């Protein structure tokens, strides 16, 4: 039969590229699970009362090429002015070797958070380097492996200051008036829910205020002034006040380390170490503290440990501080941070080394000195005598200056009374400085760069002598070796080879949705039209961004069944926090601010109780029944007991047990009956899109993990994006921003992220995914995700019982394999199985969540039947190995499972095990071998002997 032109055009071609199993494979799997079609399967599994009659209308699919052309036309509406706005964001020069070999490399961007250290040694080493950069520049003892952005790092510093403060009755936090406005905005938001009073005043007046537990100072103020706070910090320390300092990472190359001046906590943005502005993100924040406060620090910390053979190995240390273990008692609700961006900054420091970084920092400062000298020579006054890269220039005709700047396609900072701000950066040239002279002085200024350079080179007083760094930085060999591109390329490749990412194998982590991050989706993030915009540029310069964001928001509204979407939260945890704040402020608007009880099922993600605590709520746990579902009787009892104090419930759907609960609408009705709101966690949205929706189910607010359902890659532990969808009554209460007016905001709420649209430059990834899939493809993706999970469950259930199922023994998009009976019978644990899977070339499923002693498997729709069968065969082979242990063929203390994973060096070492080398490293069915570089890590050793900076280079060899 002759095909039509429409068929030949094949606008839905990408759907077949994204979805792993082809039509024939899907039918084979449907036969295996006993279903006639995808529609029949989802019709059986998803409760009838929540199934959508028609898919959301998000348009027809488009080919990769058509979608890229469409988005390119949108991006071209952005105007790329040269921005000297500063305020924590500057233009950068990302070394091409890092751009090509990391940012554009799926071996780096498709990896997951390094919970399995044996398959993560490469990015753990890069993160350890990031921590070393932080330690050297801040002068402190302990560093984290990144936070979400500078403003949220400030909020975390405030929370940490309260945790460690010896002034238990003090409840006030002092913020110096020269911090960036977006930092103050986020600090105020967090302080409100913690019940802290924020005082904003000149730093020198801090001692006038009583009952202060912590102080936030900014080393280089928002308008550019360098402050020597040594004496003030000393006085504050004598009063037992915890001192936090916000610092500029490039300025720290030249300036005294705040830690040496006595600061307890130092943080800032690592953006200007090679990460494009991207209209606000994503960017990594650095965070450091004194050793005595290490167990109160937020976020990931990479530590040096030992493996089973005694070799040096890296791991995430002190995880007992974190939300997935401590829940509402966690130091922070942070789950994903900004690993990919921290690693870009880390490798930027490796590539340039201390000499290169000093050259860059000195060049920026020299050009700033030249600009200052020329302006002063012509009679203009600078507001500050001491500066690094930012001048605050007093101008009589400010309107005229700004008009000339606009004509020259230049952005100056314009919100300073009777002055303009000018921040230079590593991209600034002498030609740029001459152009700035013309903008500020007119074309006939008569100034020459070389003449001015001679003057300032001999007599620069713009940095106080006491503020000049007098110690060496980045002395570790890793920062002094890889300065040729050949060496750098090979170093990065050596790190990449140590890790297991989606470019090598399926990552079947339950609740993580490790699906394809298609090349076409990733291409736009490096377009200069998206990468080079300052987040605070005039809105008319960002019309392309505004169109793309509005279109994406409209699609998400339709897919979720909500009325509005807020794009600001830059992680799932941040989205939870923002959604709960919207609920809190909604209740307050109705004079029901006393509603502060949050009901959370026992099966919930650890971020849920941690976020509820951050939002100032009390957590009350709701029991689950023997089938893993929310116990309705207990829910009613807890809701009734809470009464007028009920704020909300946080529920995940499908449940974290991998089941579509039949009573989800009844759950919503019970909570609404008692005046509460329903927060539906979007972690499992990949099993809803096109089939049902949170709004249709009856929820009021959800966050969406764009880094799960909508294809933003996990980046080895970030970036993420967690926008929130809300019903109309909550729309006035989503986050706002103090610097940028967000279109459609009805009331002014506090910000939760530094930038108005969070990590805006990765939103094109989700835009591309939805545009290429269309309504038809999105629904099919959800259906195939469900099919793949049920196929795995059906083939493995005899070897590993599936713990929870819904009607007809079905699961949703993931399944929980119960290892507890096997462990009781044989002594082999879920940990042993997880590590043995590495020998078979797989990342382990999620261990012991949401139920201890289990493995949770989520294959996603992107994995083909071939890959699913490879995983299933590996699991069945492991089960056969367990049977060998059970039968006594191999002793419990010496077998391939408890000794896993096995590394190459074992092949040439003496072999005394009761199983062969071949069984160890080439078990059944393994052909394309992934080699871990370390054996199983000693977690206890790592936490007892905490060491979080670079080890001697010999340890890596």
UniProtKB/Swiss-Prot annotation:
Catalytic activity: N(6)-[(R)-lipoyl]-L-lysyl-[glycine-cleavage complex H protein] + glycine + H(+) = N(6)-[(R)-S(8)-aminomethyldihydrolipoyl]-L-lysyl-[glycine-cleavage complex H protein] + CO2
Gene3D superfamilies: Aspartate Aminotransferase, domain 1 (3.90.1150.10), Type I PLP-dependent aspartate aminotransferase-like (Major domain) (3.40.640.10)
Keyword presence, ATP-binding: no
InterPro entries from the UniProt entry: GcvP (IPR003437), GDC-P_C (IPR049316), GDC-P_N (IPR049315), GDC_P (IPR020581), PyrdxlP-dep_Trfase (IPR015424), PyrdxlP-dep_Trfase_major (IPR015421), PyrdxlP-dep_Trfase_small (IPR015422)
GO biological process: glycine decarboxylation via glycine cleavage system
Cofactor(s) the record lists: pyridoxal 5'-phosphate
Top-level division of the source organism's lineage: Bacteria
CC per GO annotation: cytosol; glycine cleavage complex
Protein EC: 1.4.4.2
Keyword RNA-binding belongs to the record: no
UniProtKB keywords: Oxidoreductase, Pyridoxal phosphate
GO MF, any single term: pyridoxal phosphate binding
In-chain residues carrying the UniProt-annotated modification N6-(pyridoxal phosphate)lysine: 708
Function recorded in the entry: The glycine cleavage system catalyzes the degradation of glycine. The P protein binds the alpha-amino group of glycine through its pyridoxal phosphate cofactor; CO(2) is released and the remaining methylamine moiety is then transferred to the lipoamide cofactor of the H protein.
Subunit organization: The glycine cleavage system is composed of four proteins: P, T, L and H.
Family: Belongs to the GcvP family.
Protein name as catalogued: Glycine dehydrogenase (decarboxylating)
Organism: Shigella flexneri
